[in-house]
């Protein structure tokens, strides 16, 4: 992959802030948008290792707000970076009457306005066929890990780091790493990138398995309903093994009450689990 790295890289210094302009905005659903930001030139790539994410920084109400996002575009894309983001509006969630600071800021951005990007950030690096590097913390050196089957538990916009990996692995004919995903959402309308996930599952049936669970399923729903359970994990994800790695990303309740306790109950050890 690196032999063709002639393109200029945007994220040269992980501590620097790079102002990037909003060049396109697409409404994906009632509360989800795709934001496209322009890179310094049409030839630039972002320069983000697979497994890593970026931070967006903005001054909102005199306060510096920093949020982490995994782009859905990759370094095969030149001149732009795409983010899929769920907007947390005011007065929707009783616990968060103010809504999301950063997401509402993005929602109100006009084409041509800029926001600061910083990165790469992250503890997981995917180096190619089943080879991963995992940092125990942000500053340590990555520890080599080999996996032939990646299990994935994602909730809501926690799908973006999974999509980054799924796309990268299925695009590489030499990579036979298997992936199984449980994707949890509130309603059927909330399922992000559904079309793409189902297309990948259809074209790579031996490599990618897809399963959904919904809090409020429609009548006749053929997948699971409710929280991610131990039975669901047992049925749809690879069993505990040295060559199994389970990736988890989503809201805190999914991680703390559904994913981690059930994985531990089923005998997955700490080194078999990575939480974004």
Swiss-Prot record:
Kindly give the PROSITE patterns that the UniProt entry links to this protein. FAD_FR
Q: Which residues carry this modification: N6-acetyllysine?
A: 17
What is the tissue localization of expression for this protein? Restricted expression.
**Which is a GO BP term held by this UniProt record?**
bicarbonate transport
Report keywords, A-Z: Acetylation, FAD, Flavoprotein, Lipid biosynthesis, Lipid metabolism, NAD, Oxidoreductase, Phosphoprotein, Steroid biosynthesis, Steroid metabolism, Sterol biosynthesis, Sterol metabolism
Q: What is its EC number?
A: 1.6.2.2
Q: Which cofactors are reported in the record for this sequence?
A: FAD
Stored Pfam families: FAD_binding_6, NAD_binding_1
Q: Which GO terms describe its cellular component?
A: endoplasmic reticulum membrane; membrane; mitochondrion; nucleus
Under InterPro entries, the record lists: CBR-like (IPR001834), Cbr1-like_FAD-bd_dom (IPR008333), FAD-bd_FR_type (IPR017927), Flavoprot_Pyr_Nucl_cyt_Rdtase (IPR001709), FNR_nucleotide-bd (IPR039261), OxRdtase_FAD/NAD-bd (IPR001433), Riboflavin_synthase-like_b-brl (IPR017938)
Q: Which top-level group of life is the source organism from? A: Eukaryota
Residues holding FAD? 107-137, 146-181
GO MF terms listed in the record are: cytochrome-b5 reductase activity, acting on NAD(P)H; FAD binding
The chain residues annotated with the modification Phosphotyrosine are 18
Enzymatic reactions: 2 Fe(III)-[cytochrome b5] + NADH = 2 Fe(II)-[cytochrome b5] + NAD(+) + H(+)
* Residues of the FAD-binding FR-type domain: 15-127
| Physiological role | NADH-cytochrome b5 reductases are involved in desaturation and elongation of fatty acids, cholesterol biosynthesis, drug metabolism, and, in erythrocyte, methemoglobin reduction. Responsible for NADH-dependent lucigenin chemiluminescence in spermatozoa by reducing both lucigenin and 2-[4-iodophenyl]-3-[4-nitrophenyl]-5-[2,4-disulfophenyl]-2H tetrazolium monosodium salt (WST-1).
- Provide the family line: Belongs to the flavoprotein pyridine nucleotide cytochrome reductase family.
Full protein name: NADH-cytochrome b5 reductase 2
